[in-house]
Amino acid sequence: MNKINFTSKSTIIFLMLFLLFNTSFSQNVPVLKITDLKKRIENNSDTTYIVNFWATWCSPCVKELPDFDSISKIYKDDKVKVLLVTMDFKEEVKSKVLPFILAKKLYSEVLLLDEVNGNYFIPKISKEWSGAIPATLIVNNAYNFRHFFEKKLTYELLKTEIESVESKIKKK
């Protein structure tokens, strides 16, 4: 009887920890609408935002994520912020996105864009964007810097873009 009691208690504790673990991680992937994302990146701060649009099922996207993470780590003490905006479905946060983030050990901030109408949200990011991913917007509003890329980016190109913003800052 004691053995069954101990097993039942262990199961209950395990389930409680499992639920707590899952809940805390789901809070680490904020679900945003395009208006929320735009408010975040279109403020007048002198922070340079590197906003990468990707998905767990997109092979070129997955291949470039380590470069974005490297940039995020290198510039962690500077006014450079990498935002990895996944285009996965919000219903897949726990089943796909979180396990992916943990498996890849992503350092950068991950957000989920909860939009289904591409005709609505795509032009709000860039009129140049067809909707294909990977896509990246690099923006610094204080210095009128805005570059959009609809392709896989390399570490070298990301570093060059950041240096371009920094040179504008030094000129002012």
Regions of interest found by a model, annotated:
Residues 47-49, 53-57, 132:
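Short pre-active-site segment immediately N-terminal to redox-active cysteine/selenocysteine motifs
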Residues 53-67:
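Conserved redox-active cysteine motifs that mediate thiol-disulfide chemistry
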Residues 79-94, 106-116:
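Thiol-based oxidoreductase modules, predominantly thioredoxin-like and allied folds used
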Residues 65-86, 102:
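Conserved helix-turn-beta segment immediately C-terminal to the redox Cys motif
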Residues 134-172:
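Thiol-/selenol-based redox modules, centered on thioredoxin-like
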Residues 100-133:
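Short, internal strand/loop/helix patches
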Residues 28-48, 72:
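A short beta-strand-turn-helix
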Residues 1-32, 165:
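Bacterial Sec-dependent N-terminal signal peptides
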